[in-house]
Regions:
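Generic N-terminal simple sequence motifs
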Residues: 5, 22-23
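N-terminal acidic, proline/glycine-rich, low-complexity intrinsically disordered segments
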Residues: 2, 25-26
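Bacterial N-terminal signal peptides
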Residues: 10-21
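A cross-kingdom marker for long, charged
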Residues: 26-81, 90-396
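Bacterial N-terminal signal peptides that target proteins for export
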Residues: 2-12
Length: 396
């Protein structure tokens, strides 16, 4: 018979340790060209982000939110009216088109729709009008700052504005802007992807991908612009608020050698473990801190619909997990994940990609390259579960 010594870890503790270590690292990134990765992703029927490969039913419902989407509809109509017939033809897609799922962060990815680069000043104003109607002032500024920082990246690469630039972003519109029928729009480019689905007065703004390399313009045309600094500091404040027992649950790995996001481009069906510290195990102040952290990301959409989404998040707070990879010093690099049945948020300090030539150690993650992903798990990214319910009720 084997006798365990007093300080020998139990099998359960060992298993928990191993499981935590495994869940700290996402599956290996898909290889191959963007075209091959797109084809492989689209070959999979859409399921959505899940914890086990099966979407949890009954989370999303057709209903009135009481928050108008009329300004978004009008702005989309004005944008489409500003385009030439040729531009409009390549911008419009059916509401259930696979174009929704055709996005990724890689700057060389061939995108559909009309680009800001080919737009006239009046057309750009109409495009930003669509973003302004759909997003909060904070969300609009973040989007425009990301575009400007892509110009900064061009400056850091010998003024290579063919691959990196402020106007290398495309807009597509799925469906016809309507007060009653489903439709939406997408902006897609380097470090900025927003999918915005509308059905009546309901809005689903996900998947969202925002980030930059660099996240601060220290010189050049847009010197002084900085993004995602509050999201960075508030995440750090959250993990620092935890006591020792909570930290053992939340921190999956104190080391961060690479990239950790699960749910970037072509990962619509990613299986993401809900590991970490549950909201049920937070005190009142920590719950408030966690909700405030979620709100930083949700508040990029227009105010009324952000409030609707936050009510949804609060309803599942006890089932919401907070997970951490990396250190918690002032200069640490880290990854954190907030995961509930109705929202997935990932914040990741990434390895340098397009500034490797400027780094002392190009294999180590840096604070100057951040990727953020916001998803609606369990089948409602792109509003797909709402669209499914609508089509069942209103067969076409």
């Amino acid at each position: 018979m084997i006798t365990l010594m007093k300080n020998t870890p139990t099998l359960a503790a060992l298993f928990s340790c191993v499981l935590g270590s495994l869940s700290a690292q996402p599956p290996p990134a898909a290889g191959g060209s963007p075209v091959n990765r797109e084809a492989a992703a689209l070959a999979e029927p859409f399921v959505g982000i899940t914890t086990d490969g099966k979407a949890q039913p009954g989370l999303f419902h057709l209903r009135s939110t009481g928050v108008t989407t009329e300004p978004v509809k009008k702005a989309a109509g004005a944008f489409l009216a500003a385009l030439t017939p040729e531009q409009r033809a390549k911008t419009l897609f059916p509401v259930d088109d696979s174009e929704w799922r055709k996005w990724m962060n890689v700057h060389r990815y061939v995108r559909q729709g009309v680009s800001f680069l080919e737009m006239s000043e009046a057309q750009r104003a109409a495009a930003f009008g669509l973003l302004r109607a759909s997003l909060s002032a904070k969300g609009l500024k973040l989007s425009q700052d990301i575009m400007k920082l892509n110009h900064t990246l061009g400056e850091l690469n010998n003024n290579n504005f063919t691959e990196y630039g402020e106007w290398l972003y495309h807009i597509t519109v799925m469906g016809e802007p309507s007060a009653t029928k489903p439709w939406g729009w997408q902006i897609d480019g380097h470090h900025l992807i927003i999918n915005y689905f509308v059905l009546g007065d309901q809005v689903v703004m996900s998947p969202v991908f925002v980030g930059s390399e660099p996240v601060i313009a220290r010189a050049g045309k847009y010197q002084g612009i900085a993004i995602l600094q509050e999201e960075q500091s508030r995440g750090l404040a959250m993990v620092r608020s935890l006591d020792e027992g909570q930290r053992k649950q939340a921190i999956l790995d104190a080391n961060k050698p690479g990239n950790n996001n699960y749910a970037e481009g072509f990962k619509d069906n990613a299986v993401v473990p809900r590991t970490g510290l549950l909201g049920a195990n937070l005190n009142a102040a920590q719950r408030k801190e966690l909700l405030g952290l979620v709100e930083l990301f949700v508040d990029n959409m227009d105010g009324g619909h952000a409030q609707v989404k936050m009510a949804e998040v609060r309803a599942h707070l006890e089932q919401t997990s907070f997970a951490w990879v990396g250190g918690s010093a002032d200069d640490s690099v880290y990854y954190y994940r907030i995961h509930s049945p109705v929202v997935l948020i990932e914040f990741d300090h990434q390895r340098p990609a397009n500034t490797r030539h400027l780094q002392k150690n190009p294999q180590q993650p840096i604070r100057d390259h951040i990727h953020v992903v916001v998803r609606t798990p369990n089948g409602n990214d792109y509003g797909k579960d709402l669209l499914r319910q609508h089509l069942l009720a209103h067969p076409h």
